[in-house]
Amino acid sequence: MASLSSRLLSGFFAAFCAASSLITPVAAFAADSTVLDAGRSAEEKARDADRKPLEMLEFAQVKPGQTVVDYLPGKGYFTRIFSNAVGPTGTVYSDTPQLVIDKFKDKGLPPPVSAEPGRSNVHEVVAKGDNLGASKADLVWTSQNYHDVHIWAGAKGTADLNKSVFDALKPGGIFVVLDHAGAAGLDDAGMSNLHRIDEALVIKEVTAAGFILDGESKVLRNPADNHELKVFDPAIRGKTDQFILRFRKPG
């Protein structure tokens, strides 16, 4: 199967769910805090209080030995944590579309996490790189950028992405979408301007690909955020209201 990146790129060039109130129970997959220690900078660790990575690992039910895809990983904050969590018997794919690489190369791309010491379980995946085999992943994770897929690829490209994620997961596999919450009914222009997205739209689109909404975490919700500011506005940056949705592939 083509990589998730490749499937998303094909979407570029080829052209309210009631269950949203579900709250995940206390996780049975308790994360070990030592996964936050190895191979992470002081700068990254300083962000842990706001990003709550242990709660994220528990919600995503990450375990040693799993295969995890970190889709659009940015500087690799979660890639490193996943690498530590799945351990030497697991695999992490850091999946960045070629279009994104081309878009940001003039600004300087972060060095690949796979090149860091102790990261032999991390593999970089781009549109022309090695591919993730069909039905192999336990988890596909995307953080604060599902809205970007909409901005760059539109509804068709987003649907292609969701289908490729579904195909890449094992039966029973998990797709987690974490993003900045937008107002109900936020349109494409508002999405592009504010870098937010309506949670209900995400649920509608992902379940349309065959997924079941399996849980929601509220640990990053912020009722003080009125959803009207750009996420980069100093008044709200790092403190936006964020939804975290767990979808499961049947099986």
Across the structure, where does each feature detected by a protein language model lie?
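Class I SAM-dependent methyltransferase Rossmann-like catalytic core
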Residues: 32-59
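A short SAM/SAH-binding and catalytic strip from SAM-dependent methyltransferases
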Residues: 138-159
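Core SAM-dependent methyltransferase catalytic element
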Residues: 225-251
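A short glycine-rich, Lys/Arg-flanked "PGG" loop and its adjoining helix->strand segment in the class I
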Residues: 83-84, 156-171
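Conserved beta-strand signature within the Rossmann-like core of class I S-adenosyl-L-methionine
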Residues: 172-180
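Class I SAM-dependent methyltransferase SAM/SAH-binding core
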Residues: 75-131
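Conserved class I S-adenosyl-L-methionine
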Residues: 65-74
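A short acidic, Gly/Pro-enriched loop at the edge of an enzyme's catalytic core
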Residues: 130-140
